[in-house]
Amino acid sequence: MKNVLIATLGESPAVVTEALDVLKNRGIPIHEVVLLTTIDSAAEESLNLLTGHLSAAGIGVHPVQVEAYKDIDTDEAVMEFMEVACNQLRDMQKRGWDVYVSVAGGRKTMSALMTLAVQIYGAKELFHIIVDDPDLEEKSRIENLMYLREEEQEEILHPDISKIKFVSMPFIGLFPWISDIVKALKGEATDRKEIKELLSSNGLIEDNKPTSLGKRFLDILGRVESMPEPCPEEPEIKLSRKEPKYKEDIEKMANKIKRRFSFVCEIRDADWRRGEPKVKVEHPDRIKVYFPSGKGYNLSLILRTTAKTRGQLEAAKSEVERFMEREKL
C-alpha cells in the first residue's frame, strides 16, 4: 500500500516537513508528496526548496500548480483549484492509495477548497499543522529560509516533534455516492432520496434543477468524473529527436504534460503537418498535441491515454485544450 501526502503550499515549506515528521512518528511513512500551489513566486521558491530536500530523503515529489493564477481570488481560480484538488483525490482513490491531506500551507481559500474536496472524495486523514513558536514560524518563511545554510535549514524544517501540534479534522467522504450526486444535479432520477434532500438543503438544487452554485459544482464534478482512469504505471516519455534545438523544448513540454495528466501512459514526439489542429484525437486512445516553440520550428507530441470510450477520449482532449489555452500555446 502506498502512502501519499497531499499538501497545500504557500510561503512556508516547513509545514510540509513537519507533517511528514509527525506522520513518521506515528508509524506512517510517506512515499510520495503531492504539493498543490499557485504560480506565485514565493510558492515556487518553496516548491523548489522542498523538491530538492525531499528528493534527497528518498521521497517522491509531485508538484501540481494551478496554471495561470498567482492567487485563488476569482471565481475562475476557485473553479480551477477545486477541479485540480478533486482530480488528485479521485485518482488516488481509484489507485487504492492511502491519502493524508494537510491544509496547513497556502492561502486560506486553498485550505477551505481542499477541505471541501476531501468532503467529496475522501481521504485517510485530513489535518492541520500548528507550531506554537512565533520565532520559528517567522524563520520558516521561504524569504528567510532560502538564504540559510543547509544545516540551518534542516533545523527549521525539522523542529523537535514536541513543538508540532497535529490537529486532525473530521469529515464525511461522499465518494461512494458521487454518481448519485451528479444525477441529482442534472435533474435525473436517483434511488437515493436523501441525496436530493442534501443538495437542496445546501442550496445546490431547487425544484429539481441545479441552482447557479449547483451548476458550477456540477461542472467540476462532471469534468472530473468524465476523465479516463489514472495510468497504473509511471508514464513513459519516448523522444526520438536528438537535435539540441528541439530537445530542450520538447522534453520540457513532455514532462509538464506527464505531471499534469494522470491519464497519460506514454508520450512520443511526432511530425506536425501544416493545417492540423493544435489538439486532435486519434482513436482509440491517443491525442496528438501541436505546440509552437517560438523559435521558428514546430513540435508535436502523441499522448497514449487510458481512455476506453470515445467519450473519455473527448473529455481528455478537452482537458488538454484547456491546458494549452492556459499555457497560451
Language model features by range: what are they?
Residues 1-98, 115-329:
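Long, low-complexity, Lys/Arg-enriched
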Residues 101:
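Conformationally flexible catalytic loops at phosphate/diphosphate-handling active centers
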